[in-house]
Regions:
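Short acidic-hydrophobic, aromatic-tinged amphipathic segments that line or gate anion-handling sites
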Residues: 43-49, 121-125, 156
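ATP-binding N-terminal substructure of ATP-dependent carboxylate-amine bond-forming enzymes
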Residues: 1-94
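Solvent-exposed alpha-helices and their adjacent loops that cap or buttress functional pockets
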Residues: 21, 36-38, 90, 112-114, ...
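A conserved helix-loop-beta module that forms one wall/lid of the active-site cleft
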Residues: 90-151
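Peripheral (often C-terminal) accessory segments that flank ATP-dependent C-N-forming ligase machineries
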Residues: 310-423
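Active-site "cap" helix and flanking loop/linker of ATP-utilizing ligase/carboxylase catalytic domains
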Residues: 246-268, 285-355
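Internal nucleotide-binding/catalytic subdomain
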Residues: 152, 156-293
Length: 423
């Protein structure tokens, strides 16, 4: 089988490494891939948003199955375009990817179908949003409607901060068209949990829960990032919580999408907050999370490609999806200065014995050498029998990898360890 994977980050590297385990796979193409993925797949210089280019390549190269990993191509209809050419895909069609593509859509969906989420208001113009903020309780949360590279959510501690956030989105257009309409919602408190799930529109199979670390610096200080590390499973996500989420959130969401004529097939990501009033949805993503994938897939004992194809063919209930009961920790090594300005082009040294634990994101090949090319450079994942062991193992591997201006948090998993002690 010839497999095409759209995307070029650490998440895609994790998917590709897992798919390589399937004996039927003879060739994997990554569009565009990256310098590290090149060790595991043939990277082709076609951008993830170039839908026509992706389809042309897939047809000309006799691709048997495509996996569209990032949000942009999913929202732009990459799956629709590939399926029209008879190429089966893993990932939702554009009509279903809107669950991430529009915050206004997803909030209204939850309201209509009684899925627990934060109270909210939608605004289509700056004036009415600013007027609303005069009396709105703070802290409050301002969200751009469309995709914004994970940076379109601002938690405002004061009214002035909230107003500035509205102005930056609606007047200054920092997120372009994504800020044409915005959601202002209540600020929720409680532990956050990420749950990725496989769904074929009928069955929902949650993967192992995980805990993300969004802030750039230790102690959850600094700016929000795409994620500086993850651990799995998330200790706050107990069996009782999982049962409640399945009944009140996971199954109702899939049923709601079906009722709207937007059947979702692929990986549906639930960003949850465990509030004093029960679990609530903070966000939906229409794809595997990054860096959650880098801890969840190493714990998957079933064959990933077999599960994905069952999703595509709407027979997920027929396959076994089994996860290990071990713990995993992923530490992201970034370029110093990320998520703001940073230098790139530094050579990366990864010892051979560590490479199998590394998922490369922001790196390119230059004269045959791997060099830094992005903010988040790579993720290092370790799996062990306990969380403390997984954390320790992950950091011991990090210390063996070198590049100038490397920077990483030194407290990934610390919050999870505290939670384990509390429980």
């Amino acid at each position: 089988m010839k497999i095409l994977v759209v995307g070029g980050g650490g998440r895609e590297h994790a998917i590709i490494k897992k798919i390589k385990e399937n004996k039927e796979v003879e060739k994997i193409f990554a569009l565009p891939g990256n310098g590290g993925i090149a060790a595991d797949a043939e990277c082709v210089n076609v951008g993830a948003k170039d839908i026509d280019g992706i389809v042309d390549f897939a047809v000309k190269n006799g691709v048997d199955y495509a996996i569209v990993a990032p949000d942009d191509p999913l929202v732009l209809g990459a799956v629709d375009a590939l399926e029209e050419k008879g190429i089966p895909c893993f990932g939702p069609r554009a009509s279903a990817a809107i669950i991430e593509g529009s915050k206004v859509f997803s909030k209204n969906l939850m309201k209509k179908y009684g899925i627990p989420t934060a109270e909210y208001e939608v605004f289509y113009d700056e004036e009415s949003a600013l007027e609303y903020l005069e009396t709105a309780p703070v802290p409050t949360v301002i969200k751009a409607d469309g995709l914004a590279l994970g940076k379109g959510v601002i938690i405002a501690e004061t009214r002035e901060e909230a107003k500035n956030a509205v102005r930056s989105m609606m007047e200054d257009k920092v997120f372009g068209k994504s800020g044409d309409q915005i959601v202002i919602e209540e600020f929720l408190t409680g532990p956050e949990v990420s749950v990725l799930s496989f769904t074929d529109g009928k069955t929902v199979v949650p993967m192992v829960s995980s805990m993300d670390h969004k802030r750039a610096h230790d102690g959850d200080a600094g700016l929000n990032t795409g994620g500086m590390g993850t651990v799995a499973p998330n200790p706050y996500y107990t069996e009782a919580v999982a049962k409640e989420c399945m009944e009140k959130i996971f199954l109702p969401t899939v049923a709601a999408m079906n009722a709207e004529g937007r059947t979702f097939k692929g990986c549906l990501y639930f960003g949850l907050m465990l509030t004093p009033k029960g679990p609530k949805v903070i966000e939906y993503n229409c794809r595997f999370g990054d860096p959650e994938t880098q801890v969840v897939l190493p714990l998957l004992e079933s064959d990933l490609l077999t599960v994905m194809r069952a999703v595509t063919e709407e027979r997920l209930s027929e396959v076994e999806v089994k996860f290990s009961h071990k713990d995993a920790c992923c530490v992201i090594m970034a370029s110093d200065g990320y998520p703001e300005k940073y230098e790139k082009g530094f050579e990366i040294s990864i010892p051979e014995e560590v490479a199998k634990n590394v998922y490369v994101a922001g790196a390119a090949l230059k004269d045959g050498k791997l060099v830094t090319s992005g903010g988040r450079v790579l993720g290092v994942t370790a799996v062990a029998d306990s969380l403390p062991e997984a954390i320790e193992k992950s950091y011991s591997l990090v210390e063996k990898i070198h590049f100038d201006n490397a920077f990483y948090r030194r407290d990934i998993g610390a919050r999870a360890l505290l939670a384990k002690e509390e429980n």
